[in-house]
């Protein structure tokens, strides 16, 4: 998905101009924000025009072949209008394929290679002598609306799921120091951010590579550990939402913080499948009966918990029995928010070497449709249970007599919305109480109280 990149007032008519294209997930968006912050700190101007820019940066996604195709198309569009194209991001980890498609690229860097990107920019067009560093806010430049922001806590992943090439592209887990994360979070809160969305490739593994090292932060000693980080973020007085949670046993401990209202009662856990056979082939945890028991315990500890997950249908070797196990599991789990993907073979993924029978594309499509229809009914029932309740909603869009927002159970872009009628003006970023009056397949409807 392409993320719009804002433009800024010119610091000087002579300022060098950079056009920027940001593709991919929220983790890639954070990388784009860091690069753009550096550009602005050095006095570069951002422009929407490839043709009028001194160079173009394309931050690519390479997780799936469809994402690679989108990235290549974006590079092609830029190359048609500009001779200095700098490619970074996940596709940059495989420069040979990029050079084959576009041999005249100015520079290629890998993911999170911020210094290499800036070196390429300097080679393309030198920065001005008098940068306007005062134009850069303390929290850095964000590409999200002012009231929420993504906070990336680590890079890479130690898991080796057979369908995934993230470790190949971004390496093993590298956690940021806990003090550095908290400093960034505090700057975001000071800048008016009302919701922090915690992201990484494997959020619940935070600190494993650091061996949970202790750090002096202010007058406190903090451990670089998932639960400790969650507790500290939960003390900042804003909404804190956890994404990309691998279901390790220690995740259970975070439910206490949710029940206490410290962090949002929301878990984004990609379960991926429910059949033991398929999960084994995926190299994922395979005891979904135990997972059902954990979900039941989580909901006892935190009755307001929202569970979001993603699944892959049509994985090589998936039989009709395997798929039915998945549907039956969904009926028991009663997850609130669910997304699904049809399996795509990805170059260099271990799944390519499993010697399993591919699922025919037409079978994949039918199973995907059945999956979505099945889960839609479950999600709709879960939403109808909220009718008549008063819920907290953060406002994303506002007009004089109406607004659109999200509950604590809804992340931006991927989950549902609340359509609100109101007799008083609401502002973007407000957190208000709304009485839910109706629900449809994905969204809620209510009145501000």
Curated annotation (Swiss-Prot):
Binding site for [4Fe-4S] cluster 2: 157, 161, 164
Name of the top EC class for this enzyme: transferase
Binding site for [4Fe-4S] cluster 1: 25, 61, 90
Catalytic activity: L-aspartate(89)-[ribosomal protein uS12]-hydrogen + (sulfur carrier)-SH + AH2 + 2 S-adenosyl-L-methionine = 3-methylsulfanyl-L-aspartate(89)-[ribosomal protein uS12]-hydrogen + (sulfur carrier)-H + 5'-deoxyadenosine + L-methionine + A + S-adenosyl-L-homocysteine + 2 H(+)
Classification via InterPro entries: Elp3/MiaA/NifB-like_rSAM, Methylthiotransferase, Methylthiotransferase_CS, Methylthiotransferase_N, Methylthiotransferase_N_sf, NA-bd_OB-fold, Ribosomal_uS12_MeSTrfase_RimO, rSAM
Gene3D superfamilies: Methylthiotransferase, N-terminal domain, Nucleic acid-binding proteins, tm_1862 like domain
Disulfide-bonded cysteines: none
Cofactor(s) this protein cannot do without: [4Fe-4S] cluster
One Pfam match: TRAM_2
Classification via PROSITE patterns: MTTASE_N, MTTASE_RADICAL, RADICAL_SAM, TRAM
Keywords: 4Fe-4S, Cytoplasm, Iron, Iron-sulfur, Metal-binding, S-adenosyl-L-methionine, Transferase
Transmembrane segments: none
Keyword Ribosomal protein tagged: no
The EC number(s) this enzyme carries: 2.8.4.4
Domain TRAM: 384-449
Similarity remark: Belongs to the methylthiotransferase family. RimO subfamily.
NCBIfam families: 30S ribosomal protein S12 methylthiotransferase RimO, MiaB/RimO family radical SAM methylthiotransferase
Function per UniProt: Catalyzes the methylthiolation of an aspartic acid residue of ribosomal protein uS12.
Stated name of the protein: Ribosomal protein uS12 methylthiotransferase RimO
Organism: Beijerinckia indica subsp. indica (strain ATCC 9039 / DSM 1715 / NCIMB 8712)
Gene name, Swiss-Prot/TrEMBL: rimO
């Amino acid at each position: 998905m392409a993320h719009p990149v804002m433009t800024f007032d010119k610091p000087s008519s002579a300022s060098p101009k950079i056009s920027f294209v940001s593709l991919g997930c929220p983790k890639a968006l954070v990388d784009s924000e860091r690069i753009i912050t550096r550009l602005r700190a050095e006095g570069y101007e951002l422009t929407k025009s490839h043709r009028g820019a001194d160079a173009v940066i394309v931050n690519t996604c390479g997780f799936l072949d469809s994402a690679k195709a989108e990235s290549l198309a974006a590079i092609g569009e830029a190359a048609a209008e500009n001779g200095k194209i700098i490619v970074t991001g996940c596709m940059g980890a495989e420069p040979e394929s990029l050079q084959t498609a576009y041999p005249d690229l100015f520079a290629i860097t890998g993911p999170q290679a911020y210094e290499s990107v800036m070196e390429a920019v300097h080679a393309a067009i030198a920065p001005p002598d008098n940068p306007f560093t005062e134009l850069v806010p303390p929290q850095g430049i964000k590409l999200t609306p002012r009231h929420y922001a993504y906070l990336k806590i680590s890079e890479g992943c130690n898991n080796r799921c057979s369908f995934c090439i993230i470790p190949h592209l971004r390496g093993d887990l590298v956690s940021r120091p806990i003090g550095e994360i908290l400093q960034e979070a505090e700057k975001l809160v000071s800048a008016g951010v009302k919701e922090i969305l915690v992201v990484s490739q494997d959020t619940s593994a935070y600190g494993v590579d650091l061996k949970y090292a202790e750090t002096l932060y202010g007058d406190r000693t903090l451990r670089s550990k998932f639960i400790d980080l969650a507790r500290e973020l939960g003390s900042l007085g804003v909404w804190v939402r956890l994404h990309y949670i691998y279901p390790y046993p220690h995740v259970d401990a975070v439910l206490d913080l949710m029940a206490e209202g410290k962090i949002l009662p929301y878990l984004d856990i990609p379960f991926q499948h429910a059949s033991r056979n398929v999960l084994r082939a995926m190299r994922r945890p395979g005891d979904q009966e135990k997972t059902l028991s954990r979900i039941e315990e989580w909901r006892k500890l935190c009755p307001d918990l929202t569970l979001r997950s993603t699944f892959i249908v049509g994985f090589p070797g998936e039989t009709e029995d395997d798929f039915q196990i998945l549907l039956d599991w969904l009926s028991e789990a009663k997850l609130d928010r669910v997304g699904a993907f049809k399996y795509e073979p990805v170059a260099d993924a271990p799944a390519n070497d499993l010697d399993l029978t591919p699922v025919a594309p037409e079978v994949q499509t039918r199973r995907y449709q059945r999956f979505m229809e099945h889960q839609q009914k479950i999600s709709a029932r879960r939403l109808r249970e909220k009718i008549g309740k008063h819920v907290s909603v953060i406002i994303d869009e506002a007009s004089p007599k109406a607004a659109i927002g999200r509950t604590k159970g809804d992340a931006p872009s991927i989950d549902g919305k609340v359509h609100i009628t109101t007799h008083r003006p609401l502002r973007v970023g407000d957190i208000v109480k709304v009485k839910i009056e109706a629900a449809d397949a994905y969204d809620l409807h209510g009145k501000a109280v």
